[in-house]
Amino acid sequence: MIDLTASSTVLLCFLLCFCVLLCLCLLVRSLLLSVSLYSALILLVLILWVTVATPLLAFVVSCFCIYLWMINAHAQYLAVQ
């Protein structure tokens, strides 16, 4: 049986929310709504950073960079259309 500690449970919840919200950001066409979703994702990263910052600092920073890249890619995609 898998023994889940508090930090691993937080990490699993974060990864689930991260994947779901990131997929929603890719599917949303309205830029205003997608900015709202990106804001929720960044807030999720900040909450994770406060709760388990030390072991996952590099992971959180890389996820933050992924969010910024997704915002840029989504804006470029909408600008082309």
Swiss-Prot record:
InterPro entries the UniProt entry points to: Papilloma_E5_alpha
Keywords (A to Z) from UniProt: Early protein
A Pfam family per the record: Papilloma_E5
Family, per entry: Belongs to the papillomaviridae E5 protein family.
Protein name, as recorded: Probable protein E5
Organism: Human papillomavirus 35
Annotated gene: E5
